Structure formats: structure tokens, C-alpha cells
Amino acid sequence: MRRGDIVNTLNPASYSAVDSLTMIFDVGVSGQLTNFKEGKGRVNARNAAFEYAVGSFRLLPNVGMTVGILPFTSVGYNYSKTTFLDHTNGSLTETYAGEGGLRQVFLGAGWRVLKPLSVGVNVGYLWGDIDRSVTTSSTTYINSLARQYAFSVSSYKLDFGVQWQQKVDRHNVLTLGATVGIGHKLGSDPVCQIVNVSNADTTKFQISNGLSLPMTYAVGASWNHRDKLLVEADFSLQQWGKLDFPDISSAGGYVMQSGLLKDLYQVKAGVDYVPLPMGRNLLTRVHYRFGLGYATPYYNINGISGPKEFSMSAGFGIPISRSMLNVGAQWVHASAKDMITENTFRINLGLTFNEGWFAKWKIE
């Protein structure tokens, strides 16, 4: 997507489209409810989060710049499963918990090299902590065993983008884009502790430089008709399958292993419709939006692919002078055979300020 009144952080080449007389601020928050289902058991989890804040402006002729903070990944769950073994061994309870996340601050620039061609780059700093644990307890045994995983990240993130925009005729514009994200070692030393809760006996493992980012590739296209109808679609690939990941081995150690991760493929499509962009009636100037998405899992569980993800979203953008209030709802369904099924309902609120800060006033 390439528009002068919207910040598209997915492709830094789009920053060159920002108008020379405006400054764009975009902030967003979200709230969500997730339902976890396994067999007859159901658990609900609620949370809210500050999503992003970005600002974009014209730096030089044909050069736009963007700065901001974005989420990279978020973890938050606490789930227990109890299995009845038999009358001798009683019941076994497994509790899975996780918290934390990674965020990135970035500085990006887009340069319009030729009238149809733009290139860009995002340079970011990625940081955060993630903790996970699996605790096993039994009704017939005193000992409880916990496996605790933790890692911290403090590294860089680098993405490149290119866009080609072509006016097909008087009323239609085609935009093609592509991005590449650079994969690299994160310099993080993941830790695993195996704790016997009853006698406080702890075995600690640590792997030096054990986490990496994958190479990522994406291509997309959008069609703009009379500035009323915008249709867009994109495809992305994350090459997790080429990376090893730390895990407990069959021998009991914490080592790097292959085959735990797999390549992630994602397809998304969306529509943005405005009845009358210059109409006097507010309802005719509202942006009505709808989108669909599908993603394959990037990990295996006991040799079986994780849950596939299907998403659907709808929302609208309400113009307020030169700015825009964005309201959206999203449903995300993730499921796989013999695994937990997740249904997430999310509300997104965003406000885009588009202010004419750099206009020169003339007094006669």
C-alpha cells in the first residue's frame, strides 16, 4: 500500500509518498478475549495492550522518514490440564504458563528514485524478555517437576523494501511491492532450569547465542480505483525451517535441535471502500474495511505441525478534519488435530493525526 496520508511500516519504500506539508502521527491500542478449548475444557483470557506509535514526515525532496515503536511478539497464557491415569497412579496435572514479549523501535527512510520507483529501509532495535514454564504434579506423588525457560533479547532488526507505482489509466493506479528482512543471530543466551519443587533441587542449562531471526520475504500488490476503492493482497515467507532451536533432548540435556521449526507462509487480502471521498455527508466519507488472512504454523509439537491460523477483520475509519479515527474488530482462529483450539476476538483502536505543520502562511 502506498498513500501519503497513511504510514505503511511493512514496506519502508512507501515513506517517500508522505506529503511535504504534513506530519503524520499514528497511535493504536487493542483489547482482546481469547478462548482456549481442549476436549470439554474451556478457559478464557483477557488482556489489553498499547500497540504502536509512529510518526512520518518529509525529510528532503522525494525522501520521507518514519520513526516509531512496534510490537514484535507477545506471550501471555496460563493453562492447566489434568489427566486421570488409573486408580493406582491417580491424576497428573500439567500447567503451562508464559509471559513477556519483544518490541522494536525503528527509524526508516524511503527514497523516490524515479517517478514510479521507490526504495526504503527500516533500521530497528529489538529488545525484551520471554519466560515460559511447564509444571507437572501428581495426586499420588509428593514431587512436582517444573521446567522453566527464559531468554532476553537486545539486538538489531533490518528490513529493505521496494515499490513500483504505475498509473494504468485516468482512474486506476497499480502498486507493486516487495520486502526483505535480514536474518541473523540475536546474541541471546537462552536458559532452561529443571526444578524439583518439593526439595528445591535445580539443574540449570544455558546455551550461548542460541536464538536467531529468520530471513523473511514478502510481495504484494494494490489496486486503487478513483481513490474510492482500494484492493490489496500480499504473500510472505519466514524461513524458520532453516534455524535450529534449543530444547530438552532425549538424553536430558538442553541443546540446539533441528526439525523443531518450519517455514511460515502467510496470505492476506483486504478492501477499503469510501462511497464519496469528497462528500459533505460524514457517512459517505467513512472508510469501510474488510480483510482475510491465513497462516501456516512455524513450529512442530512432538513431530506434528502446530495450529494453522485463519483470521477475519472488519472496521471503519472516521474522518475528523484531516485526521482519522480507526476502529476495527478481528477474529483469529487457530487449531490443529489433538491440540488446543484458540479463538481470539480483538478490538483495535487507532488515531491518525495528519497535520499541516510545514505550510507557509502568506499575509497580504
Q: What is the role of each PLM region?
A:
Residues 1-70, 263:
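N-terminal, post-signal peptide beta-strand-biased segments of exported outer-membrane/organellar beta-barrel
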Residues 1, 58-364:
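Outer-membrane beta-barrel porins/channels
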